[in-house]
From Swiss-Prot:
Keywords: Isomerase, Pyridoxal phosphate. It comes from Methylococcus capsulatus (strain ATCC 33009 / NCIMB 11132 / Bath). It catalyses: L-alanine = D-alanine. One of its GO terms (cellular component) is cytosol. The gene is alr. One of its GO terms (biological process) is D-alanine biosynthetic process. This is Alanine racemase. Belongs to the alanine racemase family.
Length: 359
């Protein structure tokens, strides 16, 4: 039986996008960000598809442990660090590198008893005001870490850019200057996320931390991955399970929100918000059928969507329907659904069959 909803993952696209990043930041090591199940693409799958990555970054200790148990040997930074003593000890046991962003974590770390010094990162709050230590707190933390024999030295430092995708906004320049003052001119630093490494030369430091770029998606509003020279890894697809003829004036779907303004040939595709397709996708959101764009009509249901096939008369039951990916950028669908592509990729649910290909 052919699964109704599937995400076709182009494994060659991972290598292409990684090479693109390497060319964009040739003097930087690459810490590939594969948190949140690799933005919906599969944590272990992504790690194995990126053997040239100098390190990986995950959000949580549990994610790092999964990678170690799968045999992933590269350095693994844990961006949220640890939240208790058990998390700290598990990080040490599995060779993870937690990011230190609070005095609470430092207090725990001072009590760590280990024969092998643990690698950690120190997080500077340069202006995003989420995680990290600023000004005097940062300086004190750096000194405390330098005095800890249980910590591998020297301790690298990172920060996160809040607005790097807005190239005409002064926030990033302010953050870069702030980080420069706190971190000083020497040391192992990581600044640039996807937008940062693309748009800000000063963010291409010893380490860059690309996330969304790895998956072939642009971090910039109004631009798509293919326009940047990237290849989408995920193509979300389903198939037509019904085709029917409607009359002018017929209402479609829950609430009858869409009223046919002409005799309409309607198709039903077996995918909905239960698969991760956005419920807020508006009438007119494009899908691909037989290589042609046709519009979504009516509300998105849990398991199905309705599309107008009037201008695609050759479409028939069983045809593939592409929701985003190859030929239809996920960035465009995100605009129609009033969201961001990160959300769409991360929200693909477990009942969607993941199919690996090499295009």
């Amino acid at each position: 039986m052919v699964p109704a909803a599937r995400a076709v993952l182009d494994m060659a696209a991972f290598a292409h996008n990684f090479a693109w990043i390497r060319a964009a930041a040739p003097d930087s090591k690459i810490m590939a960000v594969i948190k949140a199940n690799a933005y919906g693409h599969g944590l272990i799958r992504a790690a194995r598809a990126l053997p040239a990555a100098d390190a990986f970054a995950v959000a949580r200790v549990e994610e790092g442990i999964v990678l170690r148990q799968a045999g992933i040997a590269q350095r693994i930074a844990v961006l949220q660090g640890y939240g208790d003593e058990e998390g700290m000890r598990l990080s040490a046991r599995h060779g993870l590198e937690p990011v230190i962003h609070s005095g609470f974590q430092l207090d725990l770390l001072e009590r760590l008893d280990t024969s092998v010094p643990m690698g950690v990162w120190l997080k500077a709050d340069s202006g995003m005001h989420r995680l990290g230590l600023a000004d005097e707190e940062f300086a004190r933390a750096r000194l405390r870490l330098a005095r800890m024999p249980q910590v591998r030295q020297p301790v690298p430092v990172m920060t996160h850019l809040a607005n790097a995708d807005a190239t005409d906004d002064p926030t990033t320049e302010i953050q870069l200057r702030c980080f420069g003052r706190m971190a000083g001119g020497r040391g192992e630093f990581s600044i640039g996320n996807s937008a940062g490494l693309m748009a800000w030369a000063a963010a291409r430091s010893a380490w860059v931390r690309p996330g969304i770029l790895l998956y072939g998606v642009s971090p910039f509003p109004g631009r798509s991955g293919p326009e940047e020279g990237l290849m989408p890894v995920m193509t979300l697809q389903s198939r037509l399970i019904a085709v029917k003829q409607l009359k002018t004036g017929d209402a479609v779907g829950y609430g009858g929100d869409f009223i046919c303004r002409r005799p309409t040939r309607m198709g039903i595709a077996a995918i909905g918000y239960g698969d991760g397709y956005p419920r807020r996708a508006a009438t007119g959101t494009p899908v691909l059928v037989r290589g042609r764009r046709v519009p979504l009509i009516g509300r998105v249901s849990m398991d199905m969507i309705s599309v107008d096939l009037t201008d695609c008369p050759s479409a028939e039951i069983g045809d593939t329907v592409t929701l985003w990916g190859q030929g239809l950028p996920v960035e465009e669908i995100a605009l129609h659904a009033d969201t961001i592509p990160y959300v769409l990729l991360c929200n693909v649910t477990q009942r969607v069959n993941m199919v690996e290909t090499v295009a």
